[in-house]
UniProtKB/Swiss-Prot annotation:
Ranges annotated as spanning the membrane: 53-73, 147-167, 183-203, 208-228, 233-253, 269-289, 336-356
Organism: Xenopus laevis
Location in or out of the cell: Cell membrane
Stretches assigned to the Cytoplasmic side: 74-146, 204-207, 254-268, 357-1196
Motif Selectivity for potassium, residue range(s) on this chain: 320-323
PANTHER family cross-referenced by the UniProt entry: CALCIUM-ACTIVATED POTASSIUM CHANNEL ALPHA CHAIN, CALCIUM-ACTIVATED POTASSIUM CHANNEL SUBUNIT ALPHA-1-RELATED
Entry protein name: Calcium-activated potassium channel subunit alpha-1
């Protein structure tokens, strides 16, 4: 009956349409009297009481399975055609080959005779071109393809929005296409989707797999129902929610638009899009079945749920909460929930935590640096750890640097740990951290490297492979320079030979401020200077590090040491009041009046080149705009040299009152060198050695035609390297410098340097050349060079020998520094310095064990006992030696008096400097100190005494170089013996020094100052040694001998009134004027090159160690101990004559230090006869005096 009523209603409606096509909808009465309002259109009438969902679903299913059936039939037909015609195809192909061959035989050229083949080829080409065109249209490789892909995605999201709007209506309802605006828009969208589907179908290589793709399935179940809706005048939500699956392609769309560039951002968007699209799609299915009901139950169990309630239900289901307020009632809904909860739970548990982690990390260390107006920033990269960053920030942000208006941006590819993060938060106002790599241009853009003031690259000083670490830093330099060639880069390098690779970078230019701080070069240079003046390594390390002043009231050695530690190196332009004065006069005025210690100036030549001159002497006159190098406690004190005015400040006694006056001076226009930005970019001070021939004093060495040049240097003999900065000899074979233990025992070495090396074939190279070069500087005369004896593994030394074979006075004893027999063979108790180095740092998990060999060797030497007969001999052969003190032999010691304990009976008195890798291991070197393990290195007794050195003290050079690159030039000039960029380029080319002929230009490079220690017990300064003032000593040494004093090396217990047996000394840097001296003090000084030392070895007192001066007062120094020197020379000659007589009986030839007949003034260690060897052994056993074997040498 109900079916008949529905049919009657439809017939009545159709009759109305036929009678009046323009009639409006009107109520139709059913047989049961019910009134139904049905919108009537021209096409098909809509009945609200009838459900037509099957028609919409059938359209999609017919489209999907119909197309799938056609594709399968076509593939089957094609396969059968290929199989059936396979044999026939072979016959045709064979016939074709025969025809071609016959055609070539008759005509000579191949001419196609089958016109049908031409048509086939043309048809295939047309189909291929259409397919290629469709592929280009839908690909993102072209602009058109990208626009089309983005448009399709945007329209899919629009269709999904229309679905959200329609979801508030019933699942199925009557709608007039001409009046429903949303249906019209949805129709337009789906027409576009249909066209795009056709392009994709044409471009697809495999039609079957294309038909089964997710995007194709979405089109099947969303496009056909729209056309059915127009025809039936009714709407069915159906499966339109499948458009949410298009969100999976969101990350691809953003990549096409170049919005997503990093892997983390792509991963984050992928996870979010998959999660959201799955959530929305599942919610749409639940919304459909719950609002429709089960078909087999005649849709009676439906419930009214909005789409958003379904989303809520799916979320609480995935999270396994399940409150129960909303739940599925239909069988289809519950069945779907059973399967969805398995996948949804897995997705929720894996995707959500990962999304939260990515979002958290991205907000923390992502993003880009925002530059602050008026504030500079630097980028720090490389080895970023808690230790390296804390050391860097401690020195860079030190309060003594005045106001540092620079922001520090750290860039590293690993996120910081909690401790490092806390350090960044502590300095959050000046420090920022970004996660990334300098090898990635995108990350360089994030930190604004193009606007950065400089880029600093830190190295891992404790790595197992130094060459690999240097290679990494060089790659960082290449990447940064490739991104921005003009950026200033300061990088740390571990190995000296790797600095050469930086010269291969086209945009690397040290004249523009680029610097490479070679840790091995400077570390070994510091240690080498300690061989010449013990304790100097500690003083220099403290000068170039920022230390806060620590006040101690007790009268202990720590009080005076810490007062000196507070001093640093600064630069400042000199006031015009100093113009025209000589360098010593300015130094005296600054020290006495301004309480400043000036040690060097920057000299600008007429060509505009700049050079750093260290204590140039009284011939140098100060010019306008001269830059001075000062030792002071803070930057404000150095400003006195810039503000000083003779008219206003001449009568002021308090230096704190010297401030800027009202006088108009030219200095006001000069920029301050204390600015964090480097002011001088000409780089001339590093263009050549620190001296220049045209500004040397007029002494006999440089006078043309002088006999000295003819006598000292022949044009046919090479004694110096090509730059004239170092002593040089022809390359020697390794076997010629080897000593056996017996040979070394028969050679009484004295005043030499013993270098103990721990290394093997697998150890990283130390770069011992950097230790030897400062000891072979040309500002020493040949007879002043200390003999160097290496004790260590021969396999390791062979690897280093290529860089050492051009240096004179070098010997090797294969053995181990832990062997007391080897140490006694090289007379370690008579050495001027024992250096302990280690290269065994590989594969050690515990960092505290990296120094085990060096610590064991140091303790081993200190526990050795010696016979004091050798010491008595040395003491008796040298006059004017204070009690408990002894001077080195003038023939072996370059400084004529570096203090050393006489009559050494215990190894504790042997001067030793030990290299440490781990700072905390310094506590094991001295057993009698009370240093706490947590004490900083510079506060420990071994470091204060100059017996320990660690590479960590060089960390401060990074910040010091950034604020003023002249500082690095000064320190390299002081510790390397005169290494220049030209010499580095030469070493990079040949990996060895090249000999050069002696010319006036190269000989002029010898005229540069050197560091020495001045004894106060006897000599011209003896009157000041007992209670005198340090300021009086400073002025007297400067006026009389052009010697610039800058520190004291004092006995540790000198302040104690009772006598002490302790021979340890500590360093006092830049003591004040009124500082009281004691007789046992040794004074650090910068002395001039002595041109007359080659004429007379004993022309100076062993106590004064003063250099030659053009002043007439220099003659008084020669006459002070003339008698003692003459007597000593007579003893030397008598002893040498006896040795020559005994050597005539020798049966064995020993090595010569240089090639025979090549160097007329060579050193020869003369052989001994068997009788003399037995006699020496007898002397050793009976504690008799051993006559030392002297070296026969001529002076150069």
């Amino acid at each position: 009956m109900a079916t008949w009523n529905a049919s009657q209603i439809i017939l009545n409606s159709m009759s109305n349409i036929i009678e009046s096509p323009q009639s409006k909808p009107r109520p139709v009465m059913a047989s049961n009297g019910a009134s139904l309002f049905i919108p009537v259109t021209m096409e098909v009438p809509c009945d609200q009481g009838t459900r037509m969902w099957w028609a919409f679903l059938a359209s999609s299913m017919v489209t999907f399975f119909g197309g799938l059936f056609i594709i399968l039939v076509w593939r089957t037909f094609k396969y059968l055609w290929t199989v059936c015609c396979h044999c026939g195809g072979k016959n045709k192909e064979a016939q074709k080959v025969v025809n071609v061959a016959s055609s070539q035989v008759t005509d000579g050229d191949y001419k196609p005779t089958d016109d049908k083949e031409e048509v086939g080829v043309a048809e295939v080409g047309w189909m291929t071109s259409v397919k290629d065109w469709a592929g280009v249209m839908i690909s993102a490789q072209t602009l058109t393809g990208r626009v089309l892909v983005v448009t399709v995605f945007a329209l899919s999201i629009g269709a999904l929005m229309i679905y959200f709007i329609d979801s508030s209506n019933p699942i199925e309802s009557c709608q007039n296409f001409y009046k429903d605006f949303t249906l019209q828009i949805d129709m337009a969208f789906n027409i576009f989707f249909l066209l795009y589907f056709g392009l994709r179908f044409i471009a697809a290589n495999d039609k079957l797999w294309f038909w089964l793709e997710v995007n194709s399935v979405v089109d099947f179940f969303t496009v056909p129902p729209v056309f059915v809706s127009v025809y039936l005048n009714r709407s069915w939500l159906g499966l339109r929610f499948l458009r949410a699956l298009r969100l999976i392609q969101f990350s691809e769309i953003l990549q096409f638009l170049n919005i997503l560039k990093t892997s983390n951002s792509i991963k984050l968007v992928n996870l979010c899009s998959i999660f959201i699209s799955t959530w929305l799609t599942a919610a749409g299915f639940i919304h459909l079945v719950e609002n429709s009901g089960d078909p087999w139950r005649n849709f009676e169990n439906s419930q009214d749920l909005s789409y958003w309630e379904c989303m809520y239900l799916l979320m609480v289901t995935m999270s396994t909460v399940g409150y129960g307020d909303v739940y599925a009632k239909t069988t289809l809904g519950r069945l779907f929930m059973v399967f969805f909860i398995l996948g949804g739970l897995a997705m929720f548990a894996s995707y959500v935590p990962e999304i939260i982690e990515l979002i958290g990390n991205r907000k923390k260390y992502g993003g880009s640096y925002s530059a602050v107006s008026g504030r500079k920033h630097i980028v720090v990269c490389g080895h970023i750890t808690l230790e390296s960053v804390s050391n860097f920030l401690k020195d860079f942000l030190h309060k003594d640097r005045d106001d540092v208006n620079v922001e520090i941006v750290f860039l590293h590819n690993i996120s910081p740990n909690l401790e490092l993060e806390a350090l960044f938060k502590k300095h959050f106002t000046q420090v920022e951290f970004y996660q990334g790599s300098v090898l990635n241009p995108h990350d360089l853009a994030r930190v604004k490297i193009e606007s950065a003031d400089a880029c600093l690259i830190l190295a891992n000083k404790y790595c197992a492979d130094p060459d690999a670490e240097d290679a990494s830093n060089i790659m960082r330099v290449i990447s940064i320079k490739n991104y921005h060639p003009k950026i200033r880069i300061i990088t740390q390098m571990l190995q000296y030979h790797n600095k050469a690779h930086l010269l291969n970078i086209p945009s690397w230019n040290w004249k523009d401020g680029d610097d490479a701080i070679c840790l091995a070069e400077l570390k070994l240079g510091f240690i080498a200077q300690s061989c010449l003046a013990q304790g100097l390594s500690t003083m220099l390390a403290n000068l170039f590090s920022m230390r806060s002043f620590i006040k101690i009231e007790e009268d202990t050695w720590q009080k005076y040491y810490l007062e000196g530690v507070a001093n640093e190196m600064y630069t400042e332009y000199l006031s015009s009041a100093f113009v025209g004065l000589s360098f010593p006069a300015v130094c005296e005025l600054c020290f006495v009046k301004l309480k400043l210690l000036m040690i060097a100036i920057e000299y600008k030549s007429e060509k505009g080149e700049s050079r750093i001159l260290i204590n140039p002497g009284n011939h140098m006159k100060i010019k306008e705009g001269t830059l001075g190098f000062f030792i002071a406690s803070d930057a404000k004190e150095v400003k006195r040299a810039f503000f000083y005015c003779k008219a206003c400040h001449d009568d002021i006694t308090d230096p704190k009152r010297i401030k800027k006056c009202a006088c108009k001076r030219l200095e006001d226009e000069q920029p301050s060198a204390l600015s964090p930005k480097k002011k001088q970019r000409n780089g001339g001070m590093r263009h050549s050695p620190n001296t220049s021939p045209n500004m040397m004093r007029h002494d006999p060495l440089l006078m043309t035609g002088n006999d000295q040049i003819d006598n000292m240097d022949s044009s046919s003999v090479k004694r110096y390297d090509s730059t004239g900065m170092f002593h040089w000899c022809p390359a020697k074979e390794l076997d010629k410098v080897l000593l056996t233990r017996s040979e070394a025992a028969m050679t009484v070495l004295s005043g030499h340097v013993v270098v103990c090396i721990f290394g093997d074939m697998t150890s990283a190279l130390i770069g011992v050349r950097n230790l030897v070069m400062p000891l072979r500087a040309s500002n020493f005369h040949y007879h002043e060079l200390k003999h160097i004896v290496f004790v260590g593994s021969l396999d390791y030394i062979k690897r280093e020998w290529e860089t050492l074979h051009n240096f004179p006075k070098v010997s090797i004893l294969p053995g181990t520094p832990l062997s007391r027999a080897d140490l006694r063979a090289v007379n370690i108790n008579l050495c001027d310095m024992c250096v302990i180095l280690s290269a065994n740092q590989n594969n050690i998990d515990d960092t505290s064990l990296q120094d085990k060999e060096c610590i064991l060797a140091s303790l081993n030497i200190k526990s050795m006992q010696f016979d004091d007969s050798i010491g008595l001999l040395q003491a008796n052969s040298q006059g004017f030696t204070p009690p408990g003190m002894e001077r080195s032999s003038p023939d072996n010691s370059p400084l004529h008096g570096v203090a050393r304990q006489a009559s050494i009976t215990t190894g504790a008195n042997i001067p030793i400097i030990t290299e440490l890798v781990n700072d905390s291991n310094v506590q094991f070197l001295d057993q009698d100190d009370d240093d706490d393990p947590d004490t900083e290195l510079y506060l420990t007794q071994p470091f204060a005494c100059g017996t320990a050195f660690a590479v960590s003290v060089l960390d401060s050079l990074m910040s010091a170089t950034y604020f003023n690159d002249n500082i690095l030039t000064l320190i390299r000039t002081l510790v390397t013996g005169g290494a220049t960029p030209e010499l580095e380029a030469l070493v990079a080319e040949e990996n060895a020094l090249r000999g050069g002929y002696s010319t006036p230009q190269t000989l002029a490079n010898r005229d540069r100052c050197r560091v020495a220690q001045l004894a106060l017990y006897d000599g011209p300064f003896a009157d000041l040694g007992d209670g005198g003032c340090y300021g009086d000593l400073y002025c007297k040494a400067l006026k009389t001998y052009n010697m610039l004093c800058f520190g004291i090396y004092r006995l540790r217990d000198a302040h104690i009134s009772t006598p002490s047996q302790c021979t340890k000394r500590y360093v006092i840097t830049n003591p004040p004027y009124e500082f009281e001296l004691v007789p046992t003090d040794l004074i650090f000084c910068l002395m001039q090159f002595d041109h007359n030392a080659s004429q007379s070895r004993a022309s100076l007192s062993h106590s004064s160690h003063s250099s030659h001066s053009s002043s007439k007062k220099s003659s008084s120094v020669t006459s002070i101990l003339h008698t003692a020197s003459a007597n000593r020379q007579n003893r030397v000659k008598a002893r040498d004559s006896r040795d020559k007589q005994k050597m005539g009986q020798a049966e064995k030839k020993w090595y010569t230090d240089e090639t025979e007949n090549n160097y007329p003034r060579n050193i020869q260690i003369k052989p001994m006869s068997t009788h003399m060897a037995n006699q020496i052994n007898q002397y050793k056993s009976t504690s008799s005096l051993i006559p030392p074997i002297r070296e026969v040498e001529d002076e150069c």
